[in-house]
Amino acid sequence: MLYFLLQPLARDVRLFNLLNYITFRAAAAFVTALLVSFILGPAIIRRLRAMAVHQVVREGTPDTHAGKGTTPTMGGLIILAATFAPVLLWSRLSNRYVLLAMAVTAWMGVIGFLDDYLKLKQKREGKKNEGLVERYKLAGQVLCGLGLGAYLLLSPISTLPGASTTLPFFKYVLVVPAVAWAAWLYIPWVTFILTGVSNAVNLTDGLDGLSSGLVAIAVLTLGLFAYVLGRVDTSAYLQVFYLRGAGELTVFCAAVVGACIGFLWYNAHPAQVFMGDTGSLALGGAVGAIAILLKSEFLLLFVGAVFFAETVSVILQRTVFKYRLRRYGREYAQKHRVFRRAPLHHHFEMMGWPETQVVVRFWIIGILCAILALSTLKLR
């Protein structure tokens, strides 16, 4: 918004020329996100606490989580406010990359909000806290993925084919369908990525500061990719495809990183608030959407490695348990689980690792994977 209001005045006020630089607007978005978090955070937390919007502690979680039942949840509202306010202020709102990323984040945030709200309502009514019915939640995520995939296929936002993606470590390698009809497979591909990443971040959100820190690392990395791919000179030097307009996603990424760090101020152990599904689904949607828009879905194997491992641990745990339950009986299946507890972070807690140790070590792994992802720009 400020770009369109002040940039035309740059001839008279030279200071406004700074708005032409994505780096300046990204830095401004980051700082604004922090300020919004610090200003609105305490008020939102007080309101959530007054409304008794408390975290639901699931059965079977480590004993150290027993005291978290009084911690307010739905703190993802802080993240959403701290993301959208700076994006609306500092980004070029005519840019389709930014608009699509915002739309996906908002859509997933609404799904998460409904889930958190229904859990609260069911708790007050003395019912089982299941939240939004799983199939309805999945349907909402799938619908979002179908919409994004169809839009990108029918209205490409770059010079690259709509149904295409790139591969890390390869120069100018574009993966496209071999036949025309196969282009429609791009829609379920986008749906799979978006749904998978949003649920992966949701599964990871089980320890104080874990998912917010990992998302900040992942989105910061994707933001650097957006800046590189959005510049003619840098993309040519690194021999990657140029995506006109993609650089504006750097501003969006900076806002998300600032929102995550601002939220981490309140979510660090011992947490004053949890993001709930409102935050985790929204952040997962943002990560997935950015990777899809940058034609860099396979990059998620690096920047989202921890999220991927958490998801695999849950799938493996459930699959093996069901198999052993059917073949050997419940007693054997319960005694011979693959992990002591899934997702993976709970497994390490059950092994005796303190919560903060698990979080910091997972952050370290996330940083190392981010460095590996950045190395793909040069190792081609």
Swiss-Prot record:
Could you give a single Gene Ontology term from the biological process aspect?
peptidoglycan biosynthetic process
What is this enzyme's EC?
A: 2.7.8.13
Catalytic activity reported: UDP-N-acetyl-alpha-D-muramoyl-L-alanyl-gamma-D-glutamyl-meso-2,6-diaminopimeloyl-D-alanyl-D-alanine + di-trans,octa-cis-undecaprenyl phosphate = di-trans,octa-cis-undecaprenyl diphospho-N-acetyl-alpha-D-muramoyl-L-alanyl-D-glutamyl-meso-2,6-diaminopimeloyl-D-alanyl-D-alanine + UMP
- Keyword presence, Transmembrane: yes
**Entry's InterPro entries?**
Glycosyl_transferase_4 (IPR000715), PNAcMuramoyl-5peptid_Trfase (IPR003524), PNAcMuramoyl-5peptid_Trfase_CS (IPR018480)
| Predominant cellular place of this UniProt entry's protein | membrane
Membrane-related topology note: Multi-pass membrane protein
What the record says about family reads:
Belongs to the glycosyltransferase 4 family. MraY subfamily.
Q: What does this protein do?
A: Catalyzes the initial step of the lipid cycle reactions in the biosynthesis of the cell wall peptidoglycan: transfers peptidoglycan precursor phospho-MurNAc-pentapeptide from UDP-MurNAc-pentapeptide onto the lipid carrier undecaprenyl phosphate, yielding undecaprenyl-pyrophosphoryl-MurNAc-pentapeptide, known as lipid I.
Q: Which NCBIfam families match?
A: mraY
Under the heading PANTHER family, the entry gives: PHOSPHO-N-ACETYLMURAMOYL-PENTAPEPTIDE-TRANSFERASE, PHOSPHO-N-ACETYLMURAMOYL-PENTAPEPTIDE-TRANSFERASE HOMOLOG
Protein's name according to its UniProt entry: Phospho-N-acetylmuramoyl-pentapeptide-transferase
Organism encoding this protein: Gemmatimonas aurantiaca (strain DSM 14586 / JCM 11422 / NBRC 100505 / T-27)
